[in-house]
Every structure is written in structure tokens, then in C-alpha cells.
Amino acid sequence: EVYIYFPGGFGTLDEFFEIATLVQTKKIRKVPIILYGKDFWEPLLNFIQKTVYKEHAAIDEKDMKLYTVVDSVDEAYDYVIANVTC
């Protein structure tokens, strides 16, 4: 099982945050979460790191490691092969 999110709107963001929250709170087992497209995701992730983590301490540093950002199909494929077992 793996979750791969591509750039999208509120629905995509909702789904990403829902899965990240479920993994963070251990409501579901840890699964690989891939965010595809650095140009799209990095501004949001920078906000999370700067504001949510550093300024407000609302999450732990380990929570920012729940997901991986990739910028190519090859990177996504390599990550899946390395982190998903059947």
C-alpha cells in the first residue's frame, strides 16, 4: 500500500492531510506517502516546517518525515520499490 499525491485542489490536500494525520496518530499503520511535483508541494511543506513546526510546535520533527517529495516517475518508482513489500 502506498499513497501518491499529485498537484491538486482542496480535495487532494484534504486527502493528504487525512492520511498523514491517521499515520501520525497511529490510527493506521505507517504507509509510504509520496508527494509528486516539488514545485507544487515545497511551498506548503516550507510553511509546515516554518510555521506549524518551528513557530508553533504543533507537530514533531518526525512528523515531517511521514512523506517524501519526488519530481520524476523514476524517483517515485524507486521509492515505492524500496519501501513497499507485497
Question: Which sequence ranges carry the predicted segments?
Answer:
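A charged, well-structured terminal subsegment
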Residues: 58-86
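Conserved phosphate- and dinucleotide-binding cores of soluble alpha/beta proteins
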Residues: 1-69
